[in-house]
UniProtKB/Swiss-Prot annotation:
The keyword Transmembrane helix applies. Nucleoside transporter with broad substrate specificity. Transports adenosine with high affinity. Can also transport hypoxanthine, inosine, uridine and cytidine. Residues 286-316 are annotated as: Disordered. One of its GO terms (cellular component) is plasma membrane. Residues 286-299 have a biased composition (Basic and acidic residues). Residues 1-26, 99-107, 157-172, 230-337, 383-400, 454-465 are cytoplasmic. This is Nucleoside transporter 1. It is a multi-pass membrane protein. The lineage of its organism: Eukaryota, Discoba, Euglenozoa, Kinetoplastea, Metakinetoplastina. It comes from Crithidia fasciculata.
């Protein structure tokens, strides 16, 4: 397996900027990246954190605590069905976000629109029980909420991954850390609430309201933080089209597009020695390097050429959205294919085994599943944050195969956790230890693939980095959907035989 490409490797990355060298604008973007990571997973984490409420949602929707359900198969597997509906919807919708017509939509509109849809998902789950309905209505509510969640996630997730893919890699690491923290936060609250409130009809209802209110509050805070991003100078330098009509990203004249960014015309600092080349400088360097190379890819698609000529004819620097529309999706996919595969297979294994198989072997235990999920989430977030430290990166570009190999090596967890699930290894302690290794490996590989994908050979401008980030998000959905389907099949066979 070779990770070599036909284009030159990207310029060496700048060392991470020290915290005391950050501007307030740069720090704010880190905070927003972290909040976006939390918001991506908060709805599904809030839903999964109240399993008793979801498994007996028909009782609360019908306002009848003694109702005997008719659709027992659906309610027994409601969490899996909900997740599957959400992921299949995302899998269908997210690739559509790469269409040229969708890429014309302003970045801020996409972010706020996707976030608003995620808020609606939780509101639907809370409003229906307040108004009351039938069991069939409760089933329909679950399906509709799952669809709404998948729609919102596909729009918001693809835009967030894409946008921060155009920033230095440390921002993607922080964003991925936020995704992991979301799970830790909800698991921690689940433990506290579970210990404080009884598992009665009213107690479970209060638990669900706490989780859902927390979710809506975090989403609302992220919504406001994203609106303020349009006035952030650091954000506009890296990705100008955040709502301001006049904000332009010059593809060739940015004074530093790496970890150290300064305003055009500002005096250079001693940190300048670490700064990566600007986008235009990278393009000029690549063009010079390949001018005599007959194998170098020079051709643009007809669509790309048309957009490029239109931008040049306008006589002004292209905006990020204009660069984005002029980007070939398939050429970017060729550049990130190995990180795409590593990321997708990693989530296939994770969602095949977690949470159903990895935590469902002791259904009579009140705490095993709760504690196991908490351990997994904590270790997952540690793995995700590890990509913020360069010591955990492959030392050279041609050593990226290590990430791919590590992703495929996680297949070893399949027999180890299946044997535990079938009680051939009947030990709760074994389950906790496995969650540590399983969580660390899942978080590390996911984060490294998402960070390294947009840093691949041939990814040398904002548009390509955005598309690369979006493709990595799609790889999560592809792997996750396949893993979820395999999980349903495995558990169905287990119940039958």
């Amino acid at each position: 397996m070779s990770l070599k490409g036909g284009t030159a490797a990207p310029a060496p990355m700048a060392p991470p900027r020290k915290w005391y060298d950050m501007t307030s604008a740069e720090f704010y973007v880190y905070v927003v990246a972290f909040m976006c990571g939390i918001s991506i997973m908060m709805p599904i984490n809030a839903v999964f954190s109240a399993p008793s409420y979801m498994l007996e949602y028909y009782l609360y929707a019908t306002k009848d605590p003694f109702l005997v359900p008719k659709m027992t198969n659906f309610w027994t597997n409601v969490m899996t069905y909900y997740n599957l509906i959400s992921m299949v919807t995302s899998l269908v919708v997210e690739p559509l976000t790469l269409l040229k017509s969708f890429r014309k939509i302003p970045m801020l509109v996409r972010l706020l629109g996707g976030l608003s849809v995620l808020i609606i998902e939780i509101i639907v789950l809370m409003v229906v029980p307040a108004r009351g309905t039938t069991e069939a209505g409760a089933v329909a509510t679950m399906c509709i909420a799952g669809f709404i969640g998948g729609l919102g996630t596909s729009i918001f997730e693809s835009t967030v991954y894409g946008m921060f893919g155009a920033f230095p890699p440390s921002f993607t690491s922080i964003m991925m850390g936020g995704v992991g923290i979301s799970g830790v936060l909800t698991s921690l609250i689940q433990i506290i609430v579970k210990a404080a409130l009884p598992d009665t009809y009213e107690g479970v209802k209060k638990q669900s309201y706490i989780y859902y209110s927390l979710d809506v509050g975090i989403q609302a805070a992220t919504f406001i933080a994203l609106i303020m991003m349009r006035f952030n100078s650091f954000a506009q330098l890296h990705f100008g089209d955040l709502g301001g009509v006049k904000s332009k990203v010059d593809a060739g004249s940015l004074a530093g597009a790496g970890e150290n960014v300064r305003e055009p015309g500002a005096e250079a600092t001693e940190l300048e020695q670490y700064t990566e080349p600007a986008i235009g400088q990278i393009q000029e360097k690549n063009a010079e390097a390949h001018k005599d190379d007959p194998l170098a890819e020079r051709e643009l698609s007809e669509e790309e050429s048309g957009d490029s000529r239109a931008v040049e004819a306008a006589g002004e620097a292209p905006t990020s959205n204009e660069i984005l529309r002029a980007t070939s999706v398939f050429s970017v996919l060729r550049s990130v294919k190995w990180m795409f595969v590593a990321c997708g297979f990693n989530f296939l294994i994770t969602l095949f085994l977690f949470p159903g198989i990895a935590t469902g072997m002791f259904p009579e235990s009140k705490w095993f599943a709760t504690v196991a999920v908490f351990i997994f989430n904590c270790c997952d977030v540690l793995g995700r944050f590890s990509s913020a430290f360069r010591i955990t990166w492959p030392r050279r570009y041609n050593q990226r195969w290590i990430i791919v190999a590590a992703s495929f090596a996680r297949v070893i967890f399949v027999p180890l956790l299946l044997l535990h699930s079938y009680h051939y290894i009947p030990s709760e302690a074994y389950g906790y230890v496995m969650q540590v290794v399983f969580g660390l490996s899942s978080g590390y590989i996911a984060s490294m693939a998402l960070v390294l994908g947009p840093q691949s050979k041939g990814i040398d401008n904002d548009g390509k980095r955005f598309v690369a980030g979006t493709l990595m998000g799609i790889s999560i959905l592809v792997g996750g959907t396949i893993g979820t389907v395999l999980s349903i099949m495995t558990q169905t066979i287990r119940e039958t035989y």
